Amino acid sequence: MSTQNTNAQNLSFVLEGIHRVKFEDRPIPEINNPHDVLVNVRFTGICGSDVHYWEHGSIGQFIVKDPMVLGHESSGVVSKVGSAVTSLKVGDCVAMEPGIPCRRCEPCKAGKYNLCVKMAFAATPPYDGTLAKYYVLPEDFCYKLPESITLQEGAIMEPLSVAVHIVKQAGINPGQSVVVFGAGPVGLLCCAVAKAYGASKVIAVDIQKGRLDFAKKYAATATFEPAKAAALENAQRIITENDLGSGADVAIDASGAEPSVHTGIHVLRAGGTYVQGGMGRSEITFPIMAACTKELNVKGSFRYGSGDYKLAVSLVSAGKVNVKELITGVVKFEDAERAFEEVRAGKGIKTLIAGVDS
């Protein structure tokens, strides 16, 4: 990998190919829309999708054909504002929502801009990501952070917004029981948001004991490590061990693993709600008999939509969700590749990359 240029104007962390990255000085992006702002990126979290592009060069139909800046979980400081910007000023600390919709297509007009057919999402080919010194966004996709939220915490607003959207899809009500499959960052945040919504029982499920130990200390009321058994058997154990009666009210999969999907369907009571938030193989088997005979509400969840980022910031500022505990490492910008290696190795919960030193 090429070394960092300390005199660069807009140093960027660029993926050239599988396991091939470099530091590259790129032009400082221009503000071409009067409603846009230029943000000096200060912290960026590493997402599983970033690591997947680094390891494989593609995710499904999204293939890295040209050099691409990685990163999309970011926070920063407003460096410059367009002439029509009214809600932000230079020096404001912001959480950065990294997907810009067209605002004109049918999903956008229906209020579901996360499903925009022309979405320009950071670090999704062909669009560059936020692991650069500067990045331009519309002002309404930058969320001013209150003084109670640090810039490090601000970078976690992205995965927290994913969790917020999943929980909103689930329609969780106070007193309900929720089983969350996958105790990675998004799964852990789903546990926290579910509790904030009033869930009385939140059971985290994972195959890694270390993650379950963290989940229990963080937000889960109970944990479950699946045995090498049939999904129906594991589901019954979850129900019995947690006194869930005829089954859980809500099951959320944040893993994308086929056994978790099966167990999630079987762990639900009749009329329960299942939300698929994790992505795995494009096609898997599915227990349609259980889904039909229990008349389950089965939903997907993709990224985040209208109001999700704002709610994420509110949950943290109100003290209802703690994201600071998830940050287990911060590395300098010049050590970005090492951070990717650590995430691939499963070290820590959430690693942040600090912004380029001025």
Swiss-Prot record:
It is an enzyme of class 1 (oxidoreductase). Its cofactor is Zn(2+). Binds 1 zinc ion per subunit. Coiled coil: none annotated. SMART domains: PKS_ER (SM00829). SUPFAM superfamilies: GroES-like, NAD(P)-binding Rossmann-fold domains. Keywords: Carbohydrate metabolism, Metal-binding, NAD, Oxidoreductase, Xylose metabolism, Zinc. Zn(2+) binds at C47, H72, E73. InterPro entries: ADH-like_C (IPR013149), ADH-like_N (IPR013154), ADH_Zn_CS (IPR002328), GroES-like_sf (IPR011032), NAD(P)-bd_dom_sf (IPR036291), PKS_ER (IPR020843), SDH-like (IPR045306). One of its GO terms (molecular function) is zinc ion binding. Xylitol dehydrogenase which catalyzes the conversion of xylitol to D-xylulose. Xylose is a major component of hemicelluloses such as xylan. Most fungi utilize D-xylose via three enzymatic reactions, xylose reductase (XR), xylitol dehydrogenase (XDH), and xylulokinase, to form xylulose 5-phosphate, which enters pentose phosphate pathway. PANTHER family: SORBITOL DEHYDROGENASE. This is Probable D-xylulose reductase A. It comes from Aspergillus niger (strain ATCC MYA-4892 / CBS 513.88 / FGSC A1513).
